[in-house]
């Protein structure tokens, strides 16, 4: 029996495994999927999770709950030795384990791209995982509670200052959603005003949303600025140490919440720990039919798709173009990969990946959005509805579609839930505190400890000396 190993349970990996279960006959192949989590995260919904418009668990699809004929292993693939048909996996107990296979499917996805900027490691939160979206929401909600206790001034404004680094879809969407959340929360905090909010979007390029054309991109900039946001284009963050943002323009300001959404980096298992061919960006070289290799040098029994693969875009007007790493492509590549794998096992012809874009749509907060399909551009409320309609259809399984719809309906009727869940991160705190709800996890009262951003000004602090290499 053919042993198929799928590395990664994101869009491409999940849909490939799901498709194989539907198409393979009994006893035709033994499929194993390895992923650090027991679920697939529908990442386009993470900005709305961060803003409290969607419940965190509703954007997660259980792998074991839907892949009944696939062996699911909770672990991190650390290396792939295709010459010997083995992969090394570090399971949840920390022990390394070798898995033998006949055919491998590499769908490990990408990681957040970082840079050696002082303070990023200590201050920033990414947005590729549900845990990060929940942490962003909790930090902003908690900041409102703390700010309401302070008099108007620098301290209050610093707590309610949000900086998002990255002007792609993830960065712009979470920026718009958090701006919408913060503005709506002012109704529940009469002590605060719109002047206390300070939102900054920073991108090194001269424009945002590179997936849309210039004029829609400029419209988004104008729209966000009208809502009181500050956009710093053609600008880089040179330091985020000690809760203070310093920009390449020389501007600096105190910051409360820093979100890093500056694009994707190659997955380490693909970039550095495999004998499969990779390109200069650390992506697996893939043919149009999703086999690993090139037309001149195919690699037998190896397939790849999704964000960790350089998949040729046959629909692009530019020769040699690669498919954009997004959910739309990853889902369709995963479905085709399952079809091609089964066809290859049965000695039939495989098909090239050819997908014409259905358009580009982004949320900018409740009631705000933008959609573009070729020359057609729709903005505002209709585009926001299109965003929700498209993604509720795209999220896998009817169970998840219904749950998301119900949450949206309840939010329309009752408004967004603004209760932070930060105490969930310290489940034993109340037990150790002996009934004092304000005691910390060690039983100590937080009033005796400085809050994360109650820090001295830069001239009173030593320079940061440890910087992490770019990932």
Task: Give the ranges of each region predicted by the language model.
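Short hydrophobic core segments
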Residues: 7, 99-109, 237, 253-263, ...
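Short glycine-rich anion-binding loops that position phosphate/pyrophosphate groups of nucleotides
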Residues: 12, 109-112, 175, 264-266
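FAD-site-proximal beta/loop scaffold in flavoenzymes
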Residues: 122-152, 243-245, 252-332
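A Rossmann-like FAD-binding core segment of flavoenzymes
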Residues: 30, 70-86, 179-294, 350
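Rossmann-like dinucleotide-binding core of oxidoreductases
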Residues: 156-212, 219, 230-232, 323-343, ...
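Beta1-alpha1 glycine-rich phosphate/pyrophosphate-binding loop at the start
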Residues: 1-79, 162-163, 169-212, 385, ...
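C-terminal, flexible cofactor-proximal segment of oxidoreductases
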Residues: 329, 333-471
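FAD-binding core/adjacent interface of flavoenzyme oxidoreductases
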Residues: 71-163, 259
